[in-house]
């Protein structure tokens, strides 16, 4: 599944894998763009898989004219060895019935590569929040049992709110309670599979609506940064904080190209 850029596979033992879920507003993917661009992470390989819709494009993190012609595909892996971070970026949607096989293959690779833990950046439909969620922060987290043992004290010190359980079938009053992440894509599948395989995984998500989701992505990376300290906090002013993240060059066309002058 994983194909390295070099002749041999990189040593990822003890690394933290950051990855997005293809979810509402593409918030996780936008957040990953910010992380990869800000940390100037190097591409170390890609996933060769039939589970994602094929796509190809220019280098989304181009900084010069020279590297702007490099190609990118639907699932690429980047790393920053100095921080023991590896990042998977997903750029297309899943082919029908292929999301679960992808999750299984991905987690098998996580185990075989020796990654210490996985952090999934995701989102969920804001309109499906319950009354309690409407009155509190839009951010939530989930930890697998094996992850709780190692980071529970740190998470508690951050005063974060864990994702609440809700009725499995909202329309039925006496249905059982379970974790539901509407609009979360593969988030729930990844979480459930990681629980059963005893993989250390954390899910960080934000309740959002479709639209211009750049502010949501900035909020999500700051939420992650509270824990991992990817960037050292400089100020309590959120505008100063947000400006520290490097916007990738590909975001210039996030909403399409400009209007052609011929129209006028």
UniProtKB/Swiss-Prot annotation:
Q: Which GO terms describe its cellular component?
A: cytosol; nucleus; protein folding chaperone complex
Q: Name one GO molecular function term.
A: molecular adaptor activity
Q: Which UniProt keywords apply?
A: Chaperone, Nucleus, Phosphoprotein
Q: How is it modified after translation?
A: Degraded by the proteasome upon completion of 20S proteasome maturation.
Phosphothreonine-modified residues are: 137
Expression across tissues: Widely expressed with highest levels in lung, brain and colon. Moderately expressed in muscle, stomach, spleen and heart. Weakly expressed in small intestine, pancreas and liver. Highly expressed in hepatocellular carcinomas with low levels in surrounding liver tissue.
Q: What is the effect of changing residue 225 to K?
A: In PRAAS4; uncertain significance
- Pfam families reported in the protein's UniProt record: PAC2
**Subcellular location field:** Nucleus
Q: Which InterPro entries match?
A: Proteasome_assmbl_chaperone_2, Proteasome_assmbl_chp_2_euk, PSMG2_sf
| One biological process term in Gene Ontology | proteasome assembly
Q: What is the disease in the record?
A: Proteasome-associated autoinflammatory syndrome 4: An autosomal recessive, autoinflammatory disorder characterized by panniculitis and erythematous skin lesions apparent in early infancy. Additional features include hepatosplenomegaly, lymphadenopathy, autoimmune hemolytic anemia, fever, generalized lipodystrophy, myositis, joint contractures, and mild motor and speech delay.
Its family remark reads: Belongs to the PSMG2 family.
PANTHER family with a match to the protein in the record: PROTEASOME ASSEMBLY CHAPERONE 2
Subunit organization: Forms a heterodimer with PSMG1. The PSMG1-PSMG2 heterodimer interacts directly with the PSMA5 and PSMA7 proteasome alpha subunits.
Q: What does this protein do?
A: Chaperone protein which promotes assembly of the 20S proteasome as part of a heterodimer with PSMG1. The PSMG1-PSMG2 heterodimer binds to the PSMA5 and PSMA7 proteasome subunits, promotes assembly of the proteasome alpha subunits into the heteroheptameric alpha ring and prevents alpha ring dimerization.
Q: What protein name does the entry list? A: Proteasome assembly chaperone 2
The organism of origin for this protein = Homo sapiens (Human)
Gene name linked to the record = PSMG2
